[in-house]
UniProtKB/Swiss-Prot annotation:
Binding-site residues, ATP: 8-15
Pfam families reported for this sequence: PapZ_C, RapZ-like_N
Protein name (record): Nucleotide-binding protein CLJ_B3680
InterPro entries per UniProt: P-loop_NTPase, RapZ-like, RapZ-like_N, RapZ_C
Species of the source: Clostridium botulinum (strain 657 / Type Ba4)
HAMAP family: RapZ_like
Length: 294
């Protein structure tokens, strides 16, 4: 089990760090009182491998409870529980700027002087910083760069490469565009099997319908160009921190053309090793039914 304790200065990026760890599959708990760490660790280790990665945020928001941290760490060591400490740091100037921009009070500056609070916090955290396994100074880091630093330390390579989860979703425009769509492609310009008597009753999942849709030159040109676009977009979306991508393919009723094209795109992405799901939202809807869907 990997047991990570995330701590550091207020405003240094602990919230973003824990979100990045969560994206890497860590079970995360924010602001756990240090005195509860031993019992929490015991409970996690008793899951017999069901929970493999844990991350806890511990900071001075715990007030007097923070002073129990070292006693809890001592207990973990004595009981043979391995742990790591990640410390987030930043310069005084950057921290002051962040607090002013967020208009939040520093938890240790009741008098309103941010610098005094930062100074007090540095003193209280000096020992835990000295014991940290990893220290990340976020003064010059953008959110994406902090995420990359977290990935480099705590991510497994194959996990990082396949972190973007893609969903290819077919739908019918008559039932509304999916609200959670990232990319929407309209394939109503393609020849429609609905008007072919022997195909109307089938869906784009049936080979005879799929073969019909894919038999046209315009269809293949569209699919090739769409795949080229996705090959360009996907790594760049991931680079900018996107972890879920929903690609929506729409036709009139969501039963024939969009289904056939969505399946083709799904198979292409799957063959390239992407983590991809397929969903046909409106495939079973009555073709004459009205109304909206999410």
């Amino acid at each position: 089990m990997r047991f990570v304790i995330v701590t550091g200065l207020s405003g240094a990026g602990k919230t973003q760090a824990i979100r990045s760890l969560e994206d890497l599959g860590f079970f995360c708990v924010d602001n756990l009182p240090p005195t509860l760490i031993p019992k929490f660790a015991e409970a996690c280790y008793q899951t017999e491998g069901k929970i493999k990665k844990i991350a806890l945020v511990i900071d001075i928001r715990g007030g007097k409870f923070f002073d129990d941290l070292f006693e809890s760490l001592k207990y973990l060591k004595e009981e043979g529980y391995k742990y790591e400490i990640l410390f987030l740091d930043a310069s005084d100037e950057v921290l002051i700027k962040r607090f002013k921009e967020s208009r939040r009070k520093h938890p240790l500056s009741p008098d309103g002087r941010i610098l005094n609070g930062i100074s007090m916090e540095r003193n209280r955290l000096r020992e835990v910083k000295d014991r940290a396994d990893n220290i990340i100074n976020t003064s010059e880091l953008a959110t994406r760069e902090l995420r990359e630093a977290i990935n480099e330390i705590y991510g497994e390579q194959d996990q990082i490469e396949n972190q973007l989860v893609i969903t290819v979703l077919s739908f019918g425009f008559k039932y509304g565009i999916p609200l959670d769509s990232d990319l929407v492609f309209d394939v109503r310009f393609l020849p429609n099997p609905y008007y072919i008597k022997e195909l109307k009753q089938y869906s784009g999942k049936d080979k005879k319908v799929s073969d019909y849709v894919m038999s046209f030159d315009v269809t293949n040109k569209f699919v090739n160009r769409l795949e080229d676009m996705l090959n360009f977009l996907i790594p760049n979306y991931f680079k900018e921190g996107k972890r879920q991508l929903i690609i929506c393919i729409g036709c009139t009723g969501g039963r024939h053309r969009s289904v056939a094209i969505a399946n083709t795109i799904y198979e292409g992405l799957k063959s390239k090793g992407h983590k991809v799901n397929i969903d046909h939202r409106d495939i079973n809807e009555d073709i004459h039914k009205g109304g909206k869907k999410l």
